[in-house]
Amino acid sequence: MEKGVGWEASWLPSGHSGLVHYVIARREITGFELPHTFSHLGKEVLPVFSSAEAARRFLASLALSDRWHVRQFSTGELVSLLFILPKRVAWVLPNPPLGHLLTQDALSYLTRRDSFIEYLIAR
């Protein structure tokens, strides 16, 4: 199995519809909401959350300015965002654990951006 492809079962909590996703974002002067990413091996990783509460807890654990907030995305909006950022974002990390972004366990859920888009479209 390709690394990062078998995560679907753990991605959505039981009973969650999966129609809404949450990303930490900052509104730019242009009105565009720039997503928060982190770097791993020279590639940008976008954390994506299945609940607003998990995203808020994650945001609270980061040392970011108060301009950052949790932004809800429909599946279509998230797919569009990922298409806009192809050169910048190479990976998606679903529901990253607090304070353990770069641990081997967390990184085992890294999913290629294109694979994540395919998953979203297929849902």
Give the residues covered by each predicted segment:
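Conserved NAD+-utilizing ADP-ribose enzyme module
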Residues: 1-123
